[in-house]
C-alpha cells in the first residue's frame, strides 16, 4: 500500500515537472524567435540558426520552424541543410507554395538546376501565374542551356510584367545565345534606352556588335 502511494506521488510529481518544463519552453519560444530575428538582422546567420534550434529542443517541430530554419541556413550558405529543412516544411504542409519557393533557393545556389526545375513545375501546377516560379524557371532553363525554353518562359513573365528590366535582360540573352542577333540587339537596345548604364545589357550589346 505504501509503495503504491509512493508510486502515485512519483507519477504526479513527474507529470507536474514535465508540465512546468513545457510551460517554461512555451513561454521562451517567442523570445527564441525574436532573438533569431535580431541575429539575422545583424548578419549573424550562424548564431541565428543556433538560437532558433533551441526551439526544436523545446518541442517545436512546426511548419514555421522548419521554414525559418531553411531560410537562415540558406543565408548562411548551408545549402544541404537548407534543402532538408525546406523539404520538412513542405511535407508538413504539402500544398505550401512558399515552402517550395524556399526550396528552390538552395537548389539553385548549388547549381542543381534539374531538381529546381522540378520544384518550379510543382509550384506552377498549383499557381500557374506565380511570378517567382516562372521567372526562376526561365533562369533555370538558361543555365541548363535550354535557351528556346528560357526565351518562352521570359516572354511569359513579360506578358504579365512587361516593365521588369531583369526579365527583359534574361530574354535578350536567351535570344543572343540562340544567335538571334537582330532580335537580341533590339531587346538590349530597348533596355539601354531606359537603363543606359545596365552592366549586363551593355555587355550583351557589345557581344551582338562583335566588340
Say what each PLM segment does.
Residues 58, 92, 125-126, 160-161, ...:
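Structural marker of alpha-solenoid helical repeat scaffolds
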Residues 40, 67, 73-74, 108, ...:
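Position-specific recognition of the canonical hydrophobic site in helix A of tetratricopeptide repeat
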Amino acid at each position: 500500500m505504501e509503495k503504491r502511494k509512493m508510486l502515485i506521488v512519483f507519477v504526479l510529481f513527474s507529470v507536474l515537472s514535465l508540465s512546468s518544463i513545457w510551460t517554461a519552453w512555451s513561454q521562451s519560444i517567442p523570445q527564441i524567435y525574436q532573438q533569431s530575428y535580431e541575429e539575422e538582422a545583424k548578419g549573424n546567420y550562424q548564431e541565428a540558426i543556433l538560437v532558433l534550434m533551441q526551439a526544436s529542443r523545446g518541442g517545436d517541430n512546426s511548419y514555421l520552424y522548419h521554414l525559418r530554419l531553411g531560410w537562415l541556413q540558406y543565408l548562411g550558405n548551408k545549402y544541404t541543410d537548407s534543402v532538408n529543412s525546406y523539404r520538412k516544411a513542405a511535407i508538413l504542409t504539402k500544398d505550401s507554395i512558399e515552402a517550395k519557393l524556399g526550396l528552390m533557393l538552395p537548389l539553385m545556389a548549388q547549381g542543381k538546376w534539374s531538381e529546381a526545375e522540378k520544384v518550379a513545375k510543382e509550384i506552377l501546377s498549383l499557381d500557374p501565374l506565380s511570378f517567382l516560379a516562372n521567372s526562376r524557371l526561365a533562369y533555370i532553363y538558361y543555365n541548363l542551356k535550354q535557351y528556346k525554353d528560357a526565351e518562352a518562359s521570359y516572354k511569359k513573365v513579360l506578358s504579365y510584367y512587361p516593365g521588369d528590366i531583369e526579365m527583359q535582360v534574361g530574354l535578350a540573352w536567351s535570344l543572343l545565345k540562340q544567335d538571334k542577333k537582330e532580335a537580341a540587339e533590339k531587346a538590349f537596345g530597348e533596355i539601354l534606352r531606359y537603363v543606359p548604364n545596365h552592366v549586363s545589357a551593355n555587355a550583351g550589346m557589345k557581344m551582338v556588335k562583335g566588340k
